[in-house]
């Protein structure tokens, strides 16, 4: 069959531009006489086929298809557009006026709402409504170029819903849609992929002779080449590609995507005759068999649940003893909270099935015997875990270790999938199990077993949810000609109905119950939660479940026929799946609107409130007999908080007692555990980290502005070095230190307080209350004592629960190879995505972690290991040789600590960081047993810490020689102690003051120590306030002064002297700090020239919109996110809630912008230094980890890392970064203006008054500042015009702003002529930032020879 010919027809039509209303997604038409009518010229359109077309098959002719092949010339331009994140869409806040930014974000909000509704309708098979939504999306002007992706989503769903729809009719439908409904939209390669997939499914009974011409025709129509069609693996399955290559032979291996080509080349799939191609029904059967647990129909009952082979049913108990992951280690006595039970359930994803054990036993190595020395069978009852770390270390050769790691990586892929995607069914099954057991015993006392209660709630809530879903489906399936006749409930159902029908009702019940229980004591209200937080949390949890299911379902479909089990082939499949997942997660840009989340959450919570009851008992006041009854478990009401009326959900005290008031459980999520395989590398801003959960490079909270800049930088390739550094952090493999864990678990299970671990305490013991007629001072003292005890009890319980989490996770990962994926905060600082257990945690967390890979100590490694122990004991300001001597003088203590950590002298507990010291003692003790210590294989991370790293950056920025010396940038024989130096300066100041008779100085002068000032010196550089510093110092003085008020008074006095001493020592640093603060203040109070009247209140009071933005040396754009919040009102079943609107363009918070810039700028520099160092260490083959300004590697690699740290710091500061920042600010905020004050009596003021009077006459009204900005904007446009005539006109224009252009020192002008509020008048001044402070003489290159820069 020949390719259809093209005729060129140019049609001109009058189209009325239809816009999206700012109030929502309703479409409105301009009036007929509106100027919005525009002319559109269409490109060539296919109207027929070549007369020479053949009819090869005798059935299919070229006249039958493909008629939709129109506008071919411009088709390429359309396919490069991908769906964007909500915050990316048409929003550049610094290239548009305030009004256009608001309009753009309004349209973005509308598009996002339409997108999410389109997706929901398609998933619910509401095809007619989906098509009407497509028509609305088509009418958004800015969205036209990306509209084909929306249409493709619709077309794909249409194909799936009716796989038997004839291909020729499918072709006619596509042609009609693109020619009639969406005239100026071009198909792309994904459209062709959908048609090919449909053709393969429809022609399941057609011979290859009939099918081949159809496929060939579509392939010839490719826009960007055939490979682009086959890259759509979310449409074309491996089976499809196998048929096209091996059966129809219409493609060659070279035309396949790189990710799947090795699979199809190395695998001959089970021959699939063309007349037996699996249709959609068959696909559904396969999916039901393989993933029944995750991909059930939405009306499936709980009894139909099947457990995937990778995830044996593990029951999560919410009362009593919870099943714990089997490990060859002592079980931990858990804090009895629902949070702890949830996390234990999650960790069961690490357990091994008999099939997996059998798979491990078949690992092949060069060793004679199987390394596991086990022959598990499917009936094996031995549940002891396998210690992969011990296996790895037992292998004698490097080759065997590499082979083991390769096999382990393939093996762990499936385990990682289970770990990230543990569903809700296990919880539901456990509730059912406990209920039936209690029923069998005749014991339904819900006070004894919370699970029984939860199962009753679940069973009573499930019919209500199903009934609501049926109502929604019924309403959505009706043809509603007039929505005005609907009541309010049904009108709301039309909005949230398509979303509510997406998830299995049983799952929604479980998620609702778990979310509310997890929100207990974390919802912002004592014994309850804020309603707004509750409804949003439940709605978002439902959405996340849907997203997770979609990724798994797509992967299951694409790879459904791949079942070959050789390790080599599995590796190819895992690689292909990884690429596929990345693609799918990147494409998942649709977010449900907050209003939909709120409504879904409120519907489900209101149903739970209706059925959730708790048993209560009381005493009859007459008979004094005990009586029993039921009370609601949750109650909705209102309370006042800080003067505001809040809607709250209160939890009954009976339920509170069972939940034990746990505080941290809300954040326990299976996706947030360490990983068993290497994280997905960061290659763009929205793809990296976990494999099945989307993460973004920056942790942002509803800040489209940040994301817009980040996306632009990523697309331009500006932040590749940031990705390089993050990927090195993520690729570092870890494991749990078994010896430290055994000691911690012994301490934990005793329940006694030990070091920073508080003891177990079930009840709060309060002192007896004094008589009511006691002296007020006695009552006040008692209340303060009670408050202190209550706060400590709450804090200790919180800390104990947090420790419990860490230990449970550590226990589950014993013997495992684990990784920590990282991303960044908005300043560029790196943090692990797994929050509960990582190397950024407390001392215990760090002591529990060691590197998976070991390295020989070598000549210098032993020295650095000894230095490391000395540092952990707080002797980090001694010369290196003295630190080594400290360790060598305590060899017997080290031996005793390692061999008798709890029964010996416990010397290790006297360290500043005891758990890390114990880990180092264990390692050093093993080293001392060896004949040649240099041969010892070390796994212990050794740290190199900066000396008040923020001050190091400030000293380098300001060229401050004295400051640089105090923070070890200058070479010296011994390390400088900046904290001790500041303490000496403060003491000298107090001694002078005491001599002059200052009583406070007399009392304090002998009490100033390094410890008193350390925290304040450390945080001063990061912008600590006077009040904050006062409390820091008060904490250090509290052991000296018993009276709290006295301690606070002395602290206020002392803080002034500490601040003055720091400023004296780091003079240049403080000048830079002042310059940063002043620059931020001016920027946040500035106005763009293209701002319009809508951004002014009464014409003279503008909303200040300018965030402070800068670019780090690594190209990462930093946007300070401090803006005023705007709230949106949403009516729900429970109450009207106010939710944040992420698409609103709000004024900046000028105070926070100013206060934030100095610390944030320094943070962005230390983050840049870390990422540069990480990338370079990765290139040199080092295992590298970082805790902000503390860098870790193997002892033997410390010397190499130290060279890298110094070279990268020099590389960073060889450029004058303050001057670079000033130049960036000048360019970024060029032509901005600010409001200033002038005395009316000055000559300049009189000139401005005359100009304003002249403008007023022309305008026929009073002139506003908005008018003055408008005319200055016109002047700038004329000056920048390419036409000389325009430029001449611009040069002759005089505006109120142009009068100040020749005045060089505007600051002096304002200072001299400003006047007060009454005598001054407001004027517009050009924004000019202050000149940067002069730079000192310090040469940063000298730190190459400073051995104490990091040590």
From Swiss-Prot:
Read off the Gene3D superfamilies from this record.
1.10.287.260, 1.10.287.280, 5' to 3' exonuclease, C-terminal subdomain, DNA-directed RNA polymerase, N-terminal domain
- Sorted alphabetically, which Pfam families does this protein's record hold? RNA_pol (PF00940), RPOL_N (PF14700)
Keyword Hydrolase in annotation: no
Locations listed in the record: Mitochondrion
Its chief place of residence is: mitochondrion
One GO term describing the cellular component: mitochondrial matrix
InterPro entries xref list: DNA-dir_RNA_pol_helix_hairp_sf, DNA-dir_Rpol_C_phage-type, DNA-dir_Rpol_phage-type, DNA/RNA_pol_sf, RNA_POL_N_sf, RPOL_N
Enzyme Commission number(s) from the entry: 2.7.7.6
What catalytic reaction does the record list? Answer: RNA(n) + a ribonucleoside 5'-triphosphate = RNA(n+1) + diphosphate
- What's an example Gene Ontology biological process for this entry? mitochondrial transcription
Please indicate if the UniProt record lists Mitochondrion as a keyword: yes
Keywords (alphabetical) are:
DNA-directed RNA polymerase, Mitochondrion, Nucleotidyltransferase, Transcription, Transferase, Transit peptide
| A Gene Ontology molecular function term of the record | DNA-directed RNA polymerase activity
Q: Where is the active site?
A: 945, 1014, 1189
PANTHER family of this UniProt entry?
DNA-DIRECTED RNA POLYMERASE, MITOCHONDRIAL (PTHR10102:SF0)
Q: What does this protein do?
A: DNA-dependent RNA polymerase catalyzes the transcription of DNA into RNA using the four ribonucleoside triphosphates as substrates.
Please state which protein family the record places this protein in: Belongs to the phage and mitochondrial RNA polymerase family.
From the Swiss-Prot or TrEMBL record, give the protein name. Answer: DNA-directed RNA polymerase, mitochondrial
Q: Which organism is it from?
A: Saccharomyces cerevisiae (strain ATCC 204508 / S288c)
Q: Which gene encodes it?
A: RPO41
